[in-house]
Structures are given as structure tokens and as C-alpha cells.
Amino acid sequence: MSDSGHSQPNVFIPGRNRRRRWMDQGPAGNLNLSEPGREKDSVLRDRDQERWEGNDEGCGYTIQKTPIILAKPASDRAKAATPAAPAPIEKPIVLMKAREEGKPTAPAEGAAVPPAAAVAKVEKEGQRPTQPVYQIQNRGMGAAASAGGSVDPVVGQAKLLPPQKMKHSIKLVDEYMNWCDSAIEFLLDQTDVLVVGVLGLQGTGKSTLMSLLSANSPDDDQRSYVFRMQSQEVRERAGNQTSGIDFFISQERIIFLDTQPILSPAILDHLINNDRKLPPEYNLPHTYVEMQSLQIAAFLFTVCHVVIVVQDWFTDFNLYRFLQTAEMLKPSTPSPSHESSGSSGSDEGIEYYPHIVFVQNKSKREDFCPRTLKQMHTVMDKLMLHSHLRYKGTLSMLDCNIFPGLPYDFVESEVNLFLIPTMESDADETISRAGTSGIPLFSLLPAYKGHPSFHSLVSRLRSQIMSMSRPQLSHTILTEKNWFHYAARIWDGVKKSSALSEYSRLLG
């Protein structure tokens, strides 16, 4: 009842209703008046009484209210549904090591863990190559990957394989003095390269020496040499084996250039007897042969770090005159590009000249006498006195302990001269040990030769040539492939040289 005496229909008092229910359960006669029943009723009454008192103490009357649900606006819900993009993180530089096959690699502490998408991509592509893929892209495959296609690990692994090993020499310049492009397949884009060329008269052993310096051993079969030697038939008819310029690159990335003999009578005889047509700028065959030799020598003086001059006796003065003529007709070092020419004006007068090594092949025992050796150095120094070629100071036989007991200053002006004896077989050594009766006197002792063995001398010559300095051939650092294109340009310039054309007209 309200203060006005009227009842309020929407007021609900749960405590009172529950009280009335248990109070109006029925007449007292229907109740169980036994002791257990009374105890149960008293417990129920006490419990309900406590509930009632609790409701009365809280707020008196309880009014049921409509629940209110709080929700965010639609714009805020869209922002909450879209996660914020993470800030761009710089890619760490990771030094990777080629892992062993069948051995999982554990990530190091502090290393960036790759995302799940990247891991799934690697698993989808297959087994990971031993080298990182980013190194493959740096070798020229990045453009293909950025164009939309992923890098194939198999193709990348093939790119990282070592270069193909050459088994024999190939032509760089053919017998008609035309340039050949087949050597570019064996070259790499690296700058640590040494170029060694050879010059010499016919039959002095140029191809044999270059084979022993490049890839072969004196014990190998001579038919397997990388540069073909003179066969018995060619030797009997006094012919030449090499024509043009042959090319070979070793596993140590050393380029060897074997050339046809200079001033060769066999080539002159071939021109005369076979009625080969001479180029229009040459009138006589011997002029053409000499100009061919000068072109090859001038080419080697421009593109080689080391030029070996082989002779089998001491000495031919015409050979030194030829070297001085080739030095005079050598093309000049190409000038730098116009972009850098203004800043390097002081370097315009610098001209490149290679190292010259004189090899005395088929030397006799008397040539290894210290007194004879000193006289040879003195004569060669006077013959090359006015030359700009680096003919001294880069190779020494005294440093190899070939002449034990001789001081280093025994030769006042030591030229780059190296003596090599005749290559002997095991049968020749056995015969040299035998006495007059044909029975070896000292079979356990080596025969006295007056010089070290052929194997030892070739090995020492090879080590000294490989350790020579490698100055820049041009004003820029050249890789192997850049050297090939540079050499092709030099060869074309040599063939069209006005100085060589003028000299050929002077020869008649």
C-alpha cells in the first residue's frame, strides 16, 4: 500500500512473497509435529529469515531495470578489426655459412627468426642449396627474380659451380690472323689474373715449356700436353706446329698464350710453295712473315704481364733487334675515359711495359758454370740497355739456391735469365750412369750433371713466374672477361696500326 492507500501493481517484493509462501503452506494440522520434522522446518524458517533480512538491509524494495548494453561505434569497430601495420624493420646483415648436408642448422642467439611465410616458401621450393640464394642473385639473377619469377635453386647452384676445367688449348688467333671468341666461355668476372705469353724462334721448345708451366708434368705423356708439341713428322720436314696464338687458362687463373714462331722459315716456305694470296698491303712474302711476327710481339707486349723469350743457344742478335723493333711499334696504352681524364692529368704519360724473362732452353753443363753465367748476364744487359721492357730485377737464379756458395751480388747487373737443361727420360739417366762396360757403376747414386734436375728447375721457374707482380694493363682494373675484350680491341688496333703499315712500306 502507498501513502495514499492505493496499491501499486508493478512493485515486486520477493522477500515478502517468499515469507508468505512458507507461512501459508497449510493448516497446522497437516504439519508433522515429530522432532525431525520440527527441526527441518526450523532450519528452513531460519534460512529464509536470513534471506529476508538481507534484502531488507540492502535497499528495501528492489525494482527490476532494463539492462543497458554498451557498444562501440561502427568506425571504431572497423579500426579495431584491422590490425595496425608494423613499422618497417631494417633487414639485418647475416653472415651465413654453408651447412653440411643432412645436418640441421640451429639459429644463433640474437639472430632474426624468419617469418612463417618465408619458411613455407623454402619448404615448397625443395631442398635449400648449400649457398645462400642472395649470393646467386648478386651474380646477375636479381633482374630475373625482380621481374616476377623466383630464383630456381638448381640454376643458382649451377651458377656457383667452379669454372669448367680446360683440357687442351684453343685458338685465340687463327692461322689467318683472325680473332676467335671461343675463349670467353672459360673466363670469369674476377680481377686476380696473370697473363703469360711466349715468343721464340722455330723449334726452341715454346709449346713444351708452356705446357710444363701451365698444367703438365715432365712425367706426363707428351701427347697429352695442353699445347701440342712438334710431332716426329713435323720435325723431319722442318715445319712448325703452332699457328696463330693458342689460349689456355689454368686452375690458378693464369692465362697462357702460345704463339707461332717468329721469323719462321717454315711459314715463309708455306707461303711461297702454296701460292697463298698475300694481303694487298704486302708485296713480298718475307715482308708479310716479318710483319706477322711483329704484330704478335706488339700484341703480347700490350696484353701480357710476363713475356717469355725462349732461345736454345746463346745468342742470336737478330732476336734482340726484333724485340726492340716490336717495342717501338707497340701500341700505346689506351687513355682513360673522358670522365676521369681531367682529374688524372699526371698519368697521361705513363706507358705500360711487361716483364721479359729470357729462358735458355736445352742448356749444356758448361752453361751452368758461374763464370759463363756472369758473362751471359753482362752481354744481355748491354744488348737491352736502352729498352723500356722490364728485363731485370724480377727473376733470379741465385735466389733459387741453384748455385750454392755464390753470393747474391756475384752478378752486378742480373738479367731475368733462367737456364733449363735438355729434358731427359729415365732411360737416358740410366745410360749416363753406366760406365764403359755398360753396367751402372753407382746405381744408387744419381749421375753427375753439373746442374739440378730438369724437374727441379722447371718447378722453380714456374714458382718465380707465378709470384711476379701483376701491374695494371690499362688505366682501369680488368677482370678476366674485360681482359678478353681489351685484348680483342688491341689486336684489331695492331692490325690497323699506321706505324706498322709505315714500317712495312720501309721494308719494301
Curated annotation (Swiss-Prot):
Region (Disordered): 1-59
Keywords in alphabetical order: Nonsense-mediated mRNA decay
Record's compositionally biased regions (Polar residues): 1-10
GO biological process: nuclear-transcribed mRNA catabolic process, nonsense-mediated decay
Transmembrane helix as UniProt keyword: no
Signal peptide annotation: none
InterPro entries noted in UniProt: P-loop_NTPase, SMG9
Matching PANTHER family: NONSENSE-MEDIATED MRNA DECAY FACTOR SMG9 (PTHR14270:SF0)
Family: Belongs to the SMG9 family.
Main function: Involved in nonsense-mediated decay (NMD) of mRNAs containing premature stop codons. Is recruited by release factors to stalled ribosomes together with smg1 and smg8 (forming the SMG1C protein kinase complex) and, in the SMG1C complex, is required for the efficient association between smg1 and smg8.
Protein name, as recorded: Nonsense-mediated mRNA decay factor SMG9
Gene responsible for this protein: smg9
